[in-house]
Amino acid sequence: MTSASNPPAFRLETSDGDEEGSAEVNKGKNEPPPMESPFQGEDRNFSPQIKVNLNYRKGLGPSQQDPNRFDRDRLFSVVSRGVPEELTGLLEYLRRTSKYLTDSAYTEGSTGKTCLMKAVLNLQDGVNACILPLLQIDRDSGNPQPLVNAQCTDEFYRGHSALHIAIEKRSLWCVKLLVENGANVHIRACGRFFQKHQGTCFYFGELPLSLAACTKQWDVVTYLLENPHQPASLEATDSLGNTVLHALVMIADNSPENSALVIHMYDSLLQMGARLCPTVQLEDICNHQGLTPLKLAAKEGKIEIFRHILQREFSGLYQPLSRKFTEWCYGPVRVSLYDLSSVDSWEKNSVLEIIAFHCKSPHRHRMVVLEPLNKLLQEKWDRLIPRFFFNFACYLVYMIIFTIVAYHQPSLEQPAIPSSKATFGDSMLLLGHILILLGGIYLLLGQLWYFWRRRLFIWISFMDSYFEILFLVQALLTVLSQVLRFVETEWYLPLLVSSLVLGWLNLLYYTRGFQHTGIYSVMIQKVILRDLLRFLLVYLVFLFGFAVALVSLSREARSPKAPEDSNTTVTEKPTLGQEEEPVPYGGILDASLELFKFTIGMGELAFQEQLRFRGVVLLLLLAYVLLTYVLLLNMLIALMSETVNSVATDSWSIWKLQKAISVLEMENGYWWCRRKRHRAGRLLKVGTKGDGIPDERWCFRVEEVNWAAWEKTLPTLSEDPSGAGITGYKKNPTSKPGKNSASEEDHLPLQVLQSH
């Protein structure tokens, strides 16, 4: 398989006269040059090369005035116009000069574009009559590096070939012609322009098959897979390890039009794969990050294609490709079985863990409310509720002890460790400090372990882990305050009370266990992160600027005895027994406190008579009131109202995401990690594979009420809703039920049906 990374074999080229271009190489470009432009000529900047001069000895090589001499400009002009008659004599010229069409003399300097690429770029009604003659001439010249597989060599278009261009031009005729003449169908276009990064780019999976699929050309896809010359492989991967299915997931953008096209192409490729290579599970192929197409959709936040893969249901010959099976239905009521492979947190790097901790999309909360994730997380939550409330009770007891100890703090002069004559209260106070220290160490280790496991996605953790960051700060303050307490440093007390305040604020973390308080907590978090932080940033800038200005003006005070129009700036020193009148704004802190009163509407514009520039001070105070009290506060209120309204539509799903994070944290908790994980669902037979082997899946039952598509007739696995008696149900053959295993009753159909 030819790859763009394989360097061509070295060959000494020939020169028969003055070559176009120069030896300068443009190194200052940060943008990709155009592959073909009617407004810009071909680049003449070539890399310096050593060549054999055929005119070194008189009589060798053609004359400079030879009318049959083919240079790059002449050749590019002929192929761009599509006039094959003007290629007459090209083969003889190449043989006479020992040249090939892939030599640097016939390629563009900046991109390495060949005459064949030039011809494909200038198709007329999908054809160019010069393509076949060029291929024949190149083959007859004995080129060791065939023109049909020549690639661009610059950093932006590296690996780009004529086959890629033909597919991009949507010319099936050209694709067939190139493949019939030996084009490599697995060549990779791996330049910067074809990689996913910020800026102008188009990532399609590098391979010709992926390009055809991403540009919605099913006829080209079919030909590449079924042609008799060199069929493309659905298992082929690009430099990132992505298959054509991964590439389709990457180009999805959640819009209705794009999603419909991507889903149709995705399903068609799966069905084609089932016919061509029935033993290969295309959706189980992982890229270099260990992600299948389903996991990649979860990580990138491609909601629509993610929904389709989870809920895909086929009938007939392609039923083994389904991930959803209708077990039983009656009118709009439907009992569905969802395949849990790669979904449940029982597996490593599962879809649930990716959505909760590794997803980059700001809309990932919309994925946890999709079935079967919604019911799966609810089942896990119901099983882990006792553990959640046990953690809540332990934390509440810890905070009560913390509060009692902080409330009964002795004077700073007393020693931290009581003497032998200490009272019972002093001993209990010391015990309380020890318990606080141990609790702080436990919280600190837990939060450090939380962020260490997410060190590769630390930015996502900081954006979403609101309470985890507060818990970390609380633990640091707690441990530091207790250390300072035992070394008898008085600064332990401010740190202690700060940790106490944070501790009670962090009690809101456990409100996510209840729907109403959890949604309310979500709104508070969003308002703080979106609006309040921006307001504080702008407000602190205003506050500092005006505070410095007022402090500077307050230093210029007038003597009380001097007339108001006096120009002197020196004040009389107070006599003995006479107190000096304080200036209104003696320092930045005092000025900031006074200005804060104006912000909340409690300030007074009255000021002492000794201020020299009273008019300027008055104008500054009025400007400050207008900018903060009138403008900033009202903008904050308006933005908070808008945030609450926008979050209200997604607050339920955001709360579900927070519950999912809590569920996974409890499953992966430090003290529970050694216990065997619970595996949801049941192992059952859902059909028969093409080779006659029973199709057994680990499935999860979900009851649904769907009035939108209830008239659609789907094959069912059972005639009645009784799940315990249907054929194909069996326990896990590899293990016996344990404490964490679900009982038979846990998997019976739910009694309460909820409409979605």
UniProtKB/Swiss-Prot annotation:
Q: Which residues are glycosylated?
A: N567
InterPro entries registered for this protein in UniProt: Ankyrin_rpt, Ankyrin_rpt-contain_sf, Ion_trans_dom, TRPV, TrpV1-4
Bilayer-crossing residues are: 388-408, 429-449, 456-476, 491-511, 533-553, 617-637
Q: Name one GO biological process term.
A: response to temperature stimulus
Q: Where is this region: Required for interaction with SLC50A1?
A: 1-385
Listed under subunit, the entry gives: Homotetramer. Interacts with a cAMP-dependent protein kinase type II regulatory subunit (PRKAR2A or PRKAR2B) and ACBD3. Interacts with SLC50A1; the interaction probably occurs intracellularly and depends on TRPV2 N-glycosylation.
What's this protein's name?
Answer: Transient receptor potential cation channel subfamily V member 2
Q: What is the species listed in this Swiss-Prot or TrEMBL entry?
A: Mus musculus
